[in-house]
Each structure stands twice: as C-alpha cells, then as structure tokens.
C-alpha cells in the first residue's frame, strides 16, 4: 500500500495556522521545513507545529539560491537554523530528534556543489517525489493543485511507490498560501473518503 507524506517549505508563514487546523481535523502529521529567519517572529506557530506532533525540518536560514553562499556560510545557516529548531522543541516541552531533517532551497540538483558541502557535514538531504507549483506568483487555483496531488498520488499507487509531496506554507518573502491550505483540505478529504472502513 502506498504511503503518502506531506511536507511544507518556507514557513512558518501567515497560512501555517490554518494549515495546522486542516491537518489536525484530518488527524494527519507532516514535516515542516522552516526558514530560520521566520522563526523569531513565529515562535508560537512553530511551537504549535511541534506540539501537534509534526516534525520540524531545516530549510536553511535565508533561502539563498544555489551558489549564492560560500560553503562555510551555508553550513553556518544550517547550524543556526538547527539551533533555532532545537529551541522550538524545548519551548514545546519536547526532545528534539538527534538529527533534524534538512531540505535545501530549490532542492538538490545534479551537479549541485552543495551536495559536497552536505557530505562533509554528514547531513542527508530530503527530496520529494512531487513538488507542487504553489510557490508561483500567482499560485495555481486550489482545484488545480488538488488535481495535481491526486494525479501524482494515483500514479504512485499504481506503481506501488510511496509519495512525498513538497508544498509551501510560506515563502522567503512571507507570502500567505491560502490555495495550498484549501488544496490540502480537499486532498485529505478525498483520501479519507477513499479509505476502507474500520
């Protein structure tokens, strides 16, 4: 049976509380790859992420483009954000995991020089099986995002592959993502309706 994982990048953002409500209503957990620069202004939201049973992941501090940071600066951004995330877990009264999941901005592409930096730091990179276009300006409609999620989940199920969606609950500019929240709500309702009765 195919397992579906949800992950969200670039938050915490203005839409994160509404997204947490949707996930709570569906009894679903996710991984939130947060930006360090957003954490100071959203400690209550980040603490709720942890208390609600979700995982916090590291999306670096500033969301710099590939090649924009020297190797040492990239490691510093990762380490700084790790420390901020560990502080969020402490605030939530929870133990932080030994290793915090890491996803670099824009993902890790072939020939990406950042791969060598991660290897030296002994850090694994978390990719995805599908990244949705909810980061675009303007974002696709909720139904377009929902349709893309369904198509990918169905294709993976037909191939007996697990799914790891990459969506966005914020942006490096602090944008809201209401279309993402609604698409996730529609998708989780669909999954719940399709689940066999207990």
Regions from the PLM with identified roles:
Residues 1-73, 80-99:
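Active-site beta->alpha N-cap acidic-glycine motif
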Residues 65-192, 196-197:
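Catalytic domains of cell-wall/extracellular-matrix polysaccharide-remodeling enzymes
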Residues 1-4, 11-18, 44, 114, ...:
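Generic structural signal for short, solvent-exposed loop/turn connectors between secondary structure elements
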């Amino acid at each position: 049976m195919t397992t579906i994982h949800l992950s969200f990048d670039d938050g915490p953002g203005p839409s994160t509380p509404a997204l947490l409500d949707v996930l709570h209503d569906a009894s679903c957990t996710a991984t939130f790859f947060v930006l360090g620069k957003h954490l100071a202004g959203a400690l209550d939201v980040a603490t709720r992420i942890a208390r609600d049973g979700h995982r916090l992941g590291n999306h670096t501090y500033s969301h710099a483009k590939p090649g924009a940071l020297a190797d040492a600066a990239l490691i510093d951004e990762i380490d700084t954000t790790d420390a901020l995330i560990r502080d969020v877990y402490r605030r939530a009264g929870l133990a932080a995991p030994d290793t915090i999941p890491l996803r670099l901005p824009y993902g890790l592409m072939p020939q990406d020089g950042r791969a060598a930096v991660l290897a030296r730091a002994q850090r694994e990179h978390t990719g995805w099986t599908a990244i949705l276009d909810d980061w675009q300006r303007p974002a696709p409609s909720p139904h377009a995002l929902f349709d893309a999620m369904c198509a990918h989940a169905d294709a993976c199920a037909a191939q007996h592959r697990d799914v790891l969606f990459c969506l966005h609950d914020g942006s490096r500019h602090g944008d809201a993502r209401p279309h993402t929240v609604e698409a996730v709500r529609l998708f989780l309702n669909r999954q719940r309706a399709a689940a066999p009765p207990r």
